[in-house]
UniProtKB/Swiss-Prot annotation:
This is Uncharacterized protein C2H8.05c. GO terms for cellular component: mitotic spindle pole body; nucleus; site of double-strand break. The modification Phosphothreonine is found at residue 92. Signal peptide: none annotated. It comes from Schizosaccharomyces pombe (strain 972 / ATCC 24843) (Fission yeast).
Amino acid sequence: MQDSSKNKQPCVSWKVSPLKAKAMSPDDVSRLFCKSSTSSATRKHDPFHKLWDRLQPKAQSTIQRTSSLPVPSSSNFKERLNNIGGLKRSRTLESSYEDETETANKLSRVSSLVSVIRQTIDRKKSLERRVREEQEEKTDNEDDNDVEISTQESLENNGLAEKKDDTSSLATLEDDIEGQEFSFDDQDLQMLQDIEDQWLSSQKQQGSPLTSDHISK
């Protein structure tokens, strides 16, 4: 009865006396960690067999814990993948939209700069042409003795009025470009125009819809 009650215990303690331990051979020591080949009915008090019985439940419990680890279901895994893919697509669309907006802003700034420079050059050319024509007209009027004085005064008054307007326009233009150490001419305008045309042609080859309005203009 005592043996059966001891066998039901989950862990069995066993001891080897110091004298017996000294007398044990290396083979006997190695058999402490091997399952006994003898039957438990014939050798109930075999410490080697009891050691194996004590270690066996621990191995089984370890296997059970390993096999009982939670595994995510396939539906949740697919849902997470879809969410990640949707997030990546939204970020891609957002970044592409920002790139298109930035490209449109750059094109608008380049076009505005070309327009301003073109208007500035046209104003300067027109002013120079007016001054030159007035000087030539004034010289011709001074050399021509047959011209009446009233006509001469009328032309001079008109010339002074136009010159005053041109002078005010030139002063306004100088105020706009005050502090700048450079000036624009036809060559600068042509260079900017080439840059704009090259950019538009490259965007058109790429099929960008942003250049349709600018190309149509």
